Structure formats: C-alpha cells, structure tokens
Regions:
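Acidic-basic catalytic patches of nuclease active cores, encompassing PD-(D/E)XK
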Residues: 1-62
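Short glycine-rich loop/turn motifs
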Residues: 70-72
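Catalytic cores of nucleic-acid endonucleases
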Residues: 92-149
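Short, well-structured alpha-helical interface segments that form or flank functional binding sites
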Residues: 35, 39-43, 66-68, 97-108
Length: 190
C-alpha cells in the first residue's frame, strides 16, 4: 500500500500537474461555475491512468437501499476490474456548510466502499481552497473514518476494512486579477 501512497504523493508533488494541467499552475483559472471541480476530477482521473489503473469519472457504486453514490473518480484494476481507489474532489471554503459537505463526502466514500464489498484499498477526500480559509479538521474526519458514520438514511457505515484514507488539500492563491493558481498541497495519510 505504501508504494501506492508514495507514487500518488510523488506524482502530485512532482511535475505531473504542471505537465498535464498547466492551467492550474501557469495560466491560472477563474473561480467561476464548476470548472475547477472538472479540472480537479480530471487531475485525479488522469493520475489514475498514469499509475496504470482504469480510471472512471463519476463511477457509480453498486445500488443498495440508500441513495445513488457516484465517486468523482474510481480507479479499477485493469486485470480483474476491482475498484481499488475511490476519490471525491470538493471545494472547501471554511464555513460550517463547507465542513458539513466534507463529512457528507467522506460518508459517501465509506458507503461506496461498503457497497463495493470493501474491495477499495484507498479512499481519497481531496479538497481545494481559494485564498485564506480555516483548515479542514482532518483529525475529526480521520476519527469519523476510524469509528464509522451514519448515512443520510440513518444506516451505520463502519470503517472500511483493509482500506486507508488520504485527506488531500490543494491551496490556490488568487492573484490581483482574481485568477487562481495552485501554490501548495498538503497530504495526510491514515
């Protein structure tokens, strides 16, 4: 597992984003509509392909009694089509609503893992922020991951077995013209 961790972090901290998505680093992106979300999902999907997976955007988890769950990116093993990595990419603005949204996304990842019979080995909750905002409470999110959560229907979702969690944050700084450029990333592995 640690080799997958190492590869993900090494590529994201290396030249991968600048080479594949130069607009995030050089030209910059206007904070409008959902373009940043599309770019972030594309970063994760492309990274999955680069690491040898069949990466699928908006990958639906098998249907169960709860709501439909579509992870922003699902990385499948090409040989046996097993889901190995589930990813959600979300804006974080530091508000109470933003904090609640991260809990919902983590819950969705955990429930999707359960629906996939706990086959994924890694869940990724990747966030992005524009400018200075309070940090997401990664310790609280890790605690939910370890103890389990309840979904919107009240069903208990236990900690995924044999699975790790990456809490990832992308920091974008707006320039004088309001254009956002990626300045830094933080990785927290559990």
């Amino acid at each position: 597992m640690s080799s997958l961790w190492d590869k993900i972090q090494e590529m994201l901290e290396g030249d991968f984003i600048e080479d594949a998505f130069p607009v995030l680093v050089r030209q910059g992106v206007k904070d409008a509509d959902v373009f940043m979300h599309s770019l972030g999902c594309s970063v994760w999907n492309t990274l999955g392909h680069e690491l040898g997976y069949m990466a699928v955007a908006e990958g639906p988890a098998p249907v169960a009694s709860g709501d439909n769950i579509r992870s922003d990116s699902v990385w499948f093993d090409k040989g046996n089509i097993t889901p190995c990595v589930l990813i959600e990419f979300e804006r974080y603005d530091g508000s109470e609503r933003g904090k609640a949204k991260l809990i919902t996304k983590l819950t969705n990842l955990m429930e999707a893992s359960q629906r996939w019979d706990h086959q994924p080995v890694l869940l990724v909750l990747s966030t992005w922020s524009s400018g200075l905002v309070s940090a997401p409470d990664f310790a609280a999110l890790e605690e939910l991951f370890r103890k389990g959560v309840s979904n919107s229907k009240g069903s208990r979702i236990p900690k995924p077995t044999g699975c790790s969690l990456l809490l990832h944050r992308m920091f974008f700084r707006p320039d004088f013209d309001g254009i956002l450029r990626l300045k830094h990333m933080k990785f927290r592995w559990s």
